Curated annotation (Swiss-Prot):
Family as reported in the entry's similarity comment: Belongs to the ferric reductase (FRE) family.
Residues exposed to the Cytoplasmic side: 178-228, 289-304, 368-373, 417-719
Binding site for heme 1: 309, 379
Gene3D superfamilies documented for this protein: Nucleotide-binding domain of ferredoxin-NADP reductase (FNR) module
Protein name: Ferric reductase transmembrane component 4
Inducers of expression: By iron deprivation.
Membrane topology label: Multi-pass membrane protein
Role noted for this protein: Siderophore-iron reductase responsible for reducing extracellular iron prior to import. Catalyzes the reductive uptake of Fe(3+) bound to dihydroxamate rhodotorulic acid. Fe(3+) is reduced to Fe(2+), which then dissociates from the siderophore and can be imported by the high-affinity Fe(2+) transport complex in the plasma membrane.
EC number(s) recorded for this UniProt protein: 1.16.1.9
Residue ranges that the UniProt entry lists as topological domain Extracellular: 19-156, 250-267, 326-346, 395
Main location: membrane
Catalytic activity line of the entry: 2 a Fe(II)-siderophore + NADP(+) + H(+) = 2 a Fe(III)-siderophore + NADPH
Amino acid sequence: MLLVHIISFLLFFQLSAAKAPPSKTSLINTHERRSIYSCYVGLRKETWGFNGSAICRYEPAIQSMLYCLYEDTHEKGYSNKTLEKGFEEMRQFCYTPKFLNMTDAEFYTSLDNGTYYIQDQPKAGINITYPIRLNTTLRKAYYDAYYGYYYNHDIPYYFGGIICAYFVGVMLLAGLIRFLNYTPIKKIMFQQKLVNYVRGYTTLPTLYEKHAEPFSYLKVITGYLPTRFETLVILGYLILHTIFMAYKYQYDPYHIIFAAHRAEVAHFVAYRSGILSFAHLPLIVLFAGRNNFLQLISGLKHTSFIVFHKWLGRMMFLDAIIHAAGFTNYYLYYKKWNTVRLRVYWKFGIATTCLAGMLIFFSIAAFRRHYYETFMALHIVFAALFLYTCWEHVTNFSGIEWIYAAIAIWGVDRIVRITRIALLGFPKADLQLVGSDLVRVTVKKPKKFWKAKPGQYVFVSFLRPLCFWQSHPFTVMDSCVNDRELVIVLKAKKGVTKLVRNFVERKGGKASMRLAIEGPYGSKSTAHRFDNVLLLAGGSGLPGPISHALELGKTTAASGKNFVQLVIAVRGLDMLNACKKELMALKGLNVQVHIYNSKQELASAEKISSNEVKNGETTAEKAPSSLSNSEKAPSESENTELPLSLNDTSISDLEFATFHVGRPNVEEILNESVNHSGSLAVVCCGPPIFVDTARNQTAKAVIRNPSRMIEYLEEYQAW
């Protein structure tokens, strides 16, 4: 990723070094501007003596303009202060040395002289050598026409701002609810039946029984469905966007500015869709970034912001298509297509739209899942090119501020990311192969203040020639043995994790490697604020919940009033071996540990009946596309023949834990936890189906127990 970051930086640097500064956006629907332009349109059709139609150079024409401005101003109830703003508008309109040097007093003198000699507008064809008064009906029609034109110019900026404010408002509301965690108000609120019915039916559950697990239609269309909460946020945004695209266009029934209603509609719709498209840029860049201040405020997962990022990108592209189609129709009507298509801004507009389409096309779930590194490289390069073409498209028009904001957000995110990496430097990590496909990574911390909270994650770059530019997310734990060490457990899949696993295997099962670690990311969990905590861990999603168990067990052991249960679902003993030190640290703590092994080992467990829930496989590495794939467990022979694993975990080592053969029944376990008095937090990280089951069962428990405070805290992330 380092190379594509350099390319994107160079493109952004080129933007800042442009030959001429781009035009600033200004709101133009002011009385003085409407009046000046409407008066000009009415007066330019007259035949002025001596100077023809040169209104700004012929005194009677100038006096007529000033009188028209005066009538419009006082007719609308404005004061002389507004009239003087009209004088300034006329200076800029004519923009000659004479006008630029005229004082307000000189404007008033010219107006007084013109008023003294003013006459009614004559019939057409007469050579005019005196100031005239425009026909009142026509003057008002011209004024209204320009009011509509400038209104349609300005209103999209307000609409774009409202869309940004909508998402900021949602995040502030989520942040307020998060703040209530530190007050007794939330406990009272979450014990209200109405509140819990709303939570159980609308905000907690998945949309169609799936969220972490990707949906598939005809094995071609795949992707991740949002949760119901995310769906509500997206639905609110789509409703707003639809209203803003369809609401309150001001049309001119007299066709003073546009020759036909078709041209007027095409122009207004195209302009509005273009501004709304650009208004999405800051949010799109912000939501894709790792250092998103709205994520810090709201406490929402990065996964949720990626969902919003995708939908904003899709609607931005739709707006761009409408924008392009509208202006194409407009110029075809005026028969200017062959001329305008050769202009530079038009060519950059086409390039911008094509790049937006490519960004979306190469972001489909199937492509991300199978070619994630290619997707990331293309996405960054296309995004940089997209912003560059956007810049060139509007450099002589308006809307550049949206691009300024997007680039500023991108730049701040990169600076913070570099700072995070610098805090740890490039430490050398000890890598140890566990079983056939797990690698335990131990990293010494050079800084004492660097601490990973339970459930947090880091982005790791393995500094090897074949993969140093790649950056992948992994759950991180502070070592329970040495507080100056970090621990990461990764599962080898495809790509970089497979390269790392093969490297360690070639080194005899143990190796050292330089890493670049960026993080930690993710907010501190609120699980410690609940009376009871149920920790559900599946597969290689164990590190997060086990970190919670270690912290909760230490803080609650003295009081003994809390019920903390850690439920671990594994296939074989490899994951237990990888986290053996952390598991052994639970001994003597106030944590009930239940381990479900769905793969029967030859000499490791008694046979205990258990109910089933569908099982998949996940990983502490939250790889954006690969998390959705179920992975086959290695065969028993693979486990027993590999000489590179740690000493096998045995029943005697974990005598404090209760072992089960089979898969955990999440519903039954959850119902048992609900029976304990007090509030309950359910923390889950595991295979996609396991996570979705836990989410939906928790939502049902909230509905069944509307007077209890039950919260679901999910640590699984996929994008």
